[in-house]
Amino acid sequence: FQFNEKTSPFDVERAYPNIFEEHAIMIHTDYSRETGKVYFSIRDKGIGISMDEFKRNILTTGRSWPERKEYQDEIKRMPEWLRPTGAFGIGLHTVFSVTDSLTIRTKSDSENKANEMTLYSGKKGGYAFCKKTNQTLQRGSEFSFSFLLTEELKEWVTGSNGGKLFLENVNDGIQKEIKKIMETWC
C-alpha cells in the first residue's frame, strides 16, 4: 500500500483494518477534589521524539516541519489530512498558559532507549531537563501536565456566570461531553 495525495482515510482503513482504533490518540484526564488539580495526558503511537529532535526542534519554537529534513520524504508521500499539524510551539505556549511544567515521555525508532523530558515555563526559569530512561515504552509520545482548576478557569471552561463559553467552537457532541465532565468536577 502506498500513500499519495489522493489517499483517503477510507483507503487506509480498507488496507489496514482497525488501524485507527489500534493507533488512536489517547487523551486522559483526572481531577482531584482534594488538591483541586486537573491531570491531563495525551498519548500517541507516532514517530516519537529523539533526543536530537527534541534539542533541535522543541527547544527552538518556531521551527516548522519543512525545516525538519529527516522527515521530508515521508511527509511528502502523506495525504494532506495525515500530515503533521504542529510546527511552531503554539501547543506548548497553550499548555504553559495554565501550568508551569510539562513532562514528555517518548520513544523514537531511531534510539534504543526512551527519553523523558521535563520543560518548565518562563515563569519558572524556562529550564528543560532531559534524560534517557529504562522505562519500557512503545514508539510514540506522551505529554502530561497538571494545573489547578481555579474558580476563574471553571467559569472559563464551563461558561458559567454568563462568561464566554471557551468550548463554543468545538463540535457540539464533544463540547457537551467535555462540559458535562467539567460540570461534574466542579
Locate predicted features.
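GHKL (Bergerat-fold) ATPase N-terminal catalytic module, capturing the glycine-rich phosphate-binding loop
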Residues: 1-155
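Glycine/threonine-rich ATP-lid/beta-loop region of ATP-binding domains
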Residues: 108, 138-186
